[in-house]
Amino acid sequence: MSLRAVSLACIMLVLAACSGGSQKKAGGVDPATPDQGCEGSCADTPTSLTVTDVENAIAQAVAEAQARGASATIAVVDRVGNVLAVFRMSGATTSITVSSPGTAVDGGLEGVNIVPDSLAAIAKAVTAAYLSTEGNAFTTRTASQIVQDHFNPLDSLQPAGPLFGVQFSQLPCSDLMTRFAGGAPDAGPHRSPLGLSADPGGLPLFKAGTVVGGVGVISDATYSLDVDISNVDADDDELVAVAGASGLAAPDLRRANRIAVDGRTLRFSDGSGNDLMTDPTVAPTFASINNVAGVLLAVPGYVTASVSAGTAFGHAASGIRPDTLDYPGLDAFVLVDSLNVERFRPIAGTDGAMALTAIEVQAILGEALTLANMSRAQIRRPFGTPARVSISVVDSNGVILGIVRGRDAPVFGIDVSLQKARTASFFSSTGAAAALNGVPPATYLNGGLVVLRKEPLSQYVTAAQSFLGLPNALTDGAIAFSDRAGGNLSRPFYPDGVTGNPNGPFSKPPGQWSPFSTGLQLDLVYNAIVQHIGFVLAAAPDVPTNCTGIDGFDNAFATAGVIGQLANGTQIFPGSVPIYRGNQLVGAIGVSGDGVDQDDMVAFLGVHRAGQSLGGFGNAAKPMRADTLTPQGVRLRYVNCPITPFIDSDEQNVCESK
């Protein structure tokens, strides 16, 4: 590397707080997969992880961990979350504690110390695979940067991260995510045991320019995140993962540190090949370490004690393939089951005579996908490529009416788009308050299976009604809540970003809030997450395919007051709007996969354009929208669209006056 290149890398490190630096591995060879110029179509050629790929990743990671005196648990997954292997080194910590750095936080998942190491490693691997595409390579360190109370973290005058709340998606209780059937890898997207991870140590894996999976590593006793990105960490989890990814590492031009959001460069990894203590190209074989340095694990609900090959993303076996029926000319992709039967073709709503028809649902999804294909992506490279998103439409009962995806959209957006749609529909309905008042409380753990306290969900209803100055809020359906508006109310500071401001009514106060204790969003699904941990520990049955209405461990996880409208949980960052026929709520649309302003625009304009085309439905009337409210003297936001969003047009302010 030239002196000029080194100088530029250092300057970028200081100015952008990105990982920068050399990407060389021990031995001086760049470990990044050569850039194939992939923009979303490379996966058309079936590409997947082989058994040898998985074994090599584990063997390389084990060698690096040994050199560091660390004992790690390592997981490898394919792009749709099939767990291909989990390997635990001798002496590895088997129980992990959830804990944020700094001042102790009281409640939520903070301090829970019974999380199996295997689940932490799997969650890290899934996160890296699900956040990455041919246009971007994100890691769990990237996730850490974009889910905290400020973006960038510790910048006390900046709003929360753009994907604030995404950590509680892909949940093990989701009715959308598929489950391990006990055999070979199959159709996904598969659930993640802890949602998405913000703990460094999860990296995506690439072959021939396309994402084929992820590797996750846990070698300490803490499942955490990085709250200070002004420095460069020497993190064993991350460096062991870097070694594991060698030979399958992300192309340099697609890495997070090549991508800026709101003028801030994202982080990829604080470690590179030059920081390794071993040369992965000469690591011992897997056969020589298996049952010597450690063992393959069987993880209930995820994998047997074996090594498997992954599925080829974008082809039927992966559960995601090109559409052949409903969206001609739109380069659409759909979800299918293990028999290649489409899971979510457009159907009519279930909520009575005013319900959306199948034709209307198809039109909404088609218009939204058309908009995404026209729009300039924020988080993909090269510049000028289209936004790639997942789009979900639900009715007012939360029933899935249709899901469609753009080419190479990130996998995480499937579950998140559904969460967003359901959240907008639920909080805009007449039954939200009663439903929240009727679910069991979140039973917080004090470390292990000891009750810290119980948190009733009704507290959030009371807080919202008081905060908004509307005694009938969440009961009369008078206000249309988008996810951007609901997100405003879910931040630990209101208005967002100013440390010391009061918390929103759906959030937690200081001392109780953290990314592992977000408020209503977590409390609604808390008991389900604990039950699933108990299942993996052979202490409870597995969680049902609904994340709500589950009581605490002290009541044997009994179910009561299940909220069908929120079966996969809620989401609290932008990208959804409710849908109306006149003033009658008939459902909602959720969009996820690119920048949040792009997600907002695709949802809002998708409904608008479909309604203009067919007539009879559309966005909420302006007097109903949440941006008519000014709680605490600060106006809520409804949607926020990019100023000049389209690739081949200079049209501006495309959402204005609609």
Regions found by a protein language model. Give the residues of each.
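Short, conserved catalytic or interaction motifs in soluble domains
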Residues: G20
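Flexible, solvent-exposed loop/hinge segments and secondary-structure transition points
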Residues: Q23-K658
